[in-house]
A protein has these predicted regions:
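Extracellular glycoside hydrolase catalytic/binding regions
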Residues: 146, 151-250, 280
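Short, acidic, metal-binding catalytic loop of nucleotide-sugar glycosyltransferases
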Residues: 328-337
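Aromatic-rich peripheral "rim/lid" segments of glycoside hydrolase catalytic domains that contact
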Residues: 259-307
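Active-site mouth of glycoside hydrolases
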Residues: 23-189
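A recurrent flexible, glycine/aromatic-enriched loop bordering the glycosyltransferase active site
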Residues: 421-422, 439-462, 466, 475-476, ...
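Conserved donor NDP-sugar-binding/catalytic core segment of glycosyltransferases
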Residues: 398-429, 493, 499, 505
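A conserved acidic beta->alpha catalytic loop
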Residues: 329, 344-352, 393
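Short aromatic/hydrophobic "clamp" motif used to bind/position activated sugar donors
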Residues: 386
Length: 879
């Protein structure tokens, strides 16, 4: 049993630690955990596993003098240690130990006893002001987790969390995990803690990025880092601790604990004498690492001598309602080298008057749209790095520090970070934040992004100017996507720092949300028109990376997650691998699902007058039910991941309705601006190019030698200029380039080059078709239904399915002609030589090879003069 602390503490009011985004706060001030571990120590006569009070006082005084502000204990400390911590302004992470090293879930009574002891231990601390948080476990052995399975362990840890919250609801509660069980899903804890021992700076940096992405917009604390000085020497220990601390804070962690304060360590009934992890020796003599650690802790979060100059650019149009929050947030930035430029894009409200109250540069322009305003900011910026933030967002105080750290330690051309809804926003705004269609980032790796949203978008000025700035075509949305693609096409990478965050207000009304989603639908249409090769037949973008952020769609999973344990559970880093979602189950989330339901509604309504069509009501109800079920499933999943604490019926109902409404708004914007499933892309129709089941070979003679890669890149760029969706062949594909125009068919090209000496080349380009199985199956099914309906004289159904089948056959033929013509023209355009002075020309989209009108003069024999060579390929179809 635990003895309770002095009851007088209950009557003393004090501020508790709270979580805000990625960090801890106390008294509205950010609190970086700069900690050391303390213990465990050999038991005293009274059973306490801590040194005598005089020793603790000396230790805590030395800690405080060296910039340490937090102490982690592995057992509940005695009263004097709490009071001593308060005296020296130290906070405590209190471990609540229990027998996690045995099969503790076998016996229900043992589980209840553990929960009871953890609860009593928390009560015994009596809400002492020195408490930072409670840790209800530390590294449950991986074999135990594997023995019971992750879900049972997670469920038991949730019970321990609830037990502490019942006796101290305002206390922060965590669990200390480690890489071998990183797959545990513990989002119910207040923040995440990991013990990580890596002796390579690059590996530590990469693993911290991984942990940030695994656990999202929550504080991450490394609960143990360090190095043994007995085996590595004091010099090496000091060197490693220096870069460990700088990396931990530079990568955006909320804090860390050095293991340990002293070499004195007692475990398992024995004094451990063959490990020396301490900053001081057993007799409390400082090691070389102590002043190094102290110096590193005084330069947080970024310890860099040469920081870049930032130009923070805010573009606003009638943003008076939120611009003050933005200006106040920028005013609180702790970064030493930056300017703020506000572009007033023809606002008609009071935004200019508000901005004039702050020491920033205000530039007033006509209402030319968001992209134009961003370019105005770029052209007037003094900084080498441009940091764009929306007028309805405001930055975390070290936003620029983290961006600077990321730029200094990488070669990225651009950099982004998360955008989080402010905790003070209300129910509706939080529902919108958790709904689909919000500003999210897409990551290719833990540190490299494919897309970063414009509300938190930074880029090197020379990089942005090199790619031509933002495209004025996008007046309100889509500009960030287009810019990201052009930056990557120019050969640069886009980085992501998980703690370079901004607080972003979401739409606070359903009308505003509807308007926003319609605008995003319009932006999708404009992007598809400019980048058709990135979209599929239905007009949807297939990201190469993984989408992070709220509002994700959850499909029915046919496969379970797989955990990599290693042989016999021996892997040091054990991760969970999630199977990709099934395409079939993702179809109901597409806006076009509403078109499908509308198509079913037509015969359903007709069934009121034609009894044979009443079956359509079943199909329509099924389609609607599938969509509503998926919306409820996704809304519940999003709610579980949300930071919103009030998980009420109203919140979940609004969230579900937003999941239902969002595709309609998106579809409205897409259809209105031409992004339809029946749109035409590519070189158009030419009946002479209609070949479906045989191959064709096209040829080209060149007097100038080029590599196969260069020829293929030229063909690819020609196809892009024809607004064709292009895909490169992969490492296992026996084709080089694929084009697709619609739903049912795609054409593939394979290049071979004959070398004829004197730099002369003869190119052969074989093209054939790859047909959609789904298209054939659909047409066959409709044909069968039509035949059966005619056989039984059910003419209404027969006519309907016949008409639908004829439409699909016509669509199939047009798609086949289009892709055939596109691939042919893309190759034959090689007959136009590029002027060397304009071989690479920058346009708003990126870098393109532009064909000139003058054809290449060749010396081919007459029988080679034809561009096209027809060959019988009965047995040479492409794989």
């Amino acid at each position: 049993m635990y003895e309770p602390l002095s009851l007088k503490l209950h009557s003393t009011h004090y501020e508790r630690f709270v979580i805000k985004g990625k960090f801890l706060y106390k008294n509205n001030l950010k609190f970086y955990i700069k900690g050391v571990t303390y213990g465990t120590f050999a038991p005293q006569i009274d059973g306490q596993q801590f040194p005598l009070e005089a020793v603790v006082e000396k230790d805590f005084a030395m800690m405080s003098a060296n910039g340490i502000n937090t102490v982690r204990t592995y057992t509940v400390p005695p009263i004097y240690l709490f009071d001593m911590a308060e005296k020296f302004n130290l906070s405590l992470m209190v471990g609540l130990p229990w027998e996690q090293h045995i099969t503790f879930l076998d016996d229900t009574s043992r589980q209840e006893a553990i929960i009871s002891r953890v609860s009593e231990a928390a009560i015994s601390c009596n809400q002492h002001p020195a408490i930072l948080c409670f840790a209800v476990g530390n590294e449950i052995p991986a074999p135990m987790v594997r023995w019971y399975g992750a879900k049972k362990i997670e469920a038991f840890l949730k019970k321990l969390y609830d037990a502490v919250k019942e006796v101290d609801n305002e206390a922060l509660v965590t669990y200390v995990n480690y890489p071998t069980t990183e797959y545990l899903k513990l989002s119910f804890f207040d923040f995440d803690c990991f013990n990580v021992y890596l002796e390579s700076q690059a590996k530590l940096s990469a693993y911290i990025s991984r942990l940030h992405n695994l656990y999202g917009n929550r504080p991450l604390v490394l609960a143990e880092i360090g190095l043994d000085s007995m085996r590595n020497g004091e010099d090496r220990q000091a060197e490693v601790l220096k870069w460990q601390i700088e990396t931990v804070f530079g990568k955006g962690c909320a804090g860390m604990f050095v293991f340990a304060w002293t070499d004195e360590w007692w475990r398992g009934g024995f004094e451990i004498e063959d490990w020396d992890f301490g900053l001081v020796t057993r007799d409390r003599q400082p090691k070389l690492a102590l002043p190094v650690v102290s110096n590193s802790l005084n330069k947080l979060p970024v310890n860099e001598s040469h920081l870049p100059f930032f130009s923070v650019i805010v573009c606003t149009y009638n943003g008076a309602a939120t611009i003050r929050d933005c200006m106040e947030g920028l005013k609180r930035l702790q970064y030493p080298l930056f300017e703020v430029i506000v572009i007033n894009d023809g606002s008609t409200d009071q935004v200019a008057d508000i901005v004039k109250e702050y020491p920033v540069r205000l530039i007033n322009t006509k209402n030319n749209g968001l992209s134009s305003a961003r370019n105005t900011g770029m052209n007037n910026a003094k900084g080498s790095i441009l940091a764009y933030i929306d007028d309805d967002a405001y930055p975390e105080e070290h936003w620029l520090h983290y961006l600077a750290y990321a730029y200094i330690h990488s070669r990225h051309g651009a950099m982004g970070g998360p955008n989080i809804i402010p905790p003070e926003d209300g129910l509706l705004a939080q529902s919108v934040a958790d709904a689909p269609g919000g500003p999210v980032h897409v990551l290719l790796t833990d540190e490299i992004a494919e897309h970063i949203p414009g509300c938190n978008f930074s880029v090197k000025k020379d990089v942005l100017m090199k790619v031509g700035g933002f495209d004025p075509l996008y007046r309100s949305a889509g500009d960030d996507v287009d810019a990201c693609w052009r930056i990557q096409e120019a050969g640069y990478t886009i980085g992501y720092h998980p703690s370079a965050l901004v607080w972003h207000h979401r739409r606070n009304s359903l009308k505003a949300y509807w308007k926003q989603q319609k605008g995003y639908g319009k932006a999708e249409a404009l992007l598809e028109l400019k980048w058709p090769e990135r979209y599929n037949g239905l007009g949807h973008l297939a990201w190469a990376g993984c989408i992070y952020g709220g509002g994700g769609n959850v499909t029915v999973q046919t496969k379970k997650d797989k955990i990599f344990y290693g042989t016999w559970g021996s892997a040091a880093f054990q991760s969970v691998y999630q199977p990709g979602s099934n395409f079939i189950f993702s179809i109901p989330f597409m806006p076009e699902w509403y078109l499908f339901m509308a198509m079913l509604l037509v015969p359903s309504v007709a069934g009121i007058f034609v009894p044979t069509l009443q079956w359509a009501w079943v199909a329509f109800a099924s389609a609607l039910g599938i969509f509503v079920f998926q919306a409820i499933l996704s809304a519940n999943s999003s709610a579980k991941k949300s930071a919103w604490q009030q998980q009420t019926f109203t919140y979940k109902f609004i969230l579900t309705m937003l999941y239902i409404v969002q595709p309609v708004a998106r579809l409205t914007g897409r259809l209105k601006h031409g992004l339809t499933p029946w749109r035409k892309r590519g070189a158009g129709l030419q009946l002479s190019n209609f070949y479906c089941f045989n191959s064709r070979v096209f040829t080209h003679w060149s007097e100038e030698w080029l590599s196969a890669e260069t020829w293929l890149e030229m063909i690819e760029q020609n196809l892009i200029s024809l607004r064709t969706r292009v895909l490169r062949g992969g490492a296992f594909d026996r084709w080089d380039i694929q084009v697709r125009s619609g739903w049912f068919t795609r054409a593939r090209g394979l290049l071979v080059i004959e070398e004829h000496g004197a730099n002369k080349q003869f190119l052969k380009f074989r093209c054939n078709h790859k047909h959609s199985r789904y298209g054939f199956i659909t047409i066959i099914l409709l044909s069968i239904i039509t035949f059966v309906a005619g056989l039984y004289n059910i003419w209404a159904i027969g006519v309907f399915t016949l008409f639908l089948g004829m439409l699909l056959v016509a669509k199939y033929i047009m798609d086949s002609i289009s892709v055939s013509n596109s691939l042919k023209k893309g190759f034959l355009m090689l007959g136009y030589k590029n002027d060397t002075s304009s071989e690479l020309k920058m346009v708003s989209k990126g870098i393109h090879l532009l064909p000139l009108e003058k054809p290449i003069q060749t010396t081919l024999p007459d029988w080679f003069d034809k561009h096209e060579l027809q060959i019988d390929h009965k047995s040479t179809t492409s794989n």
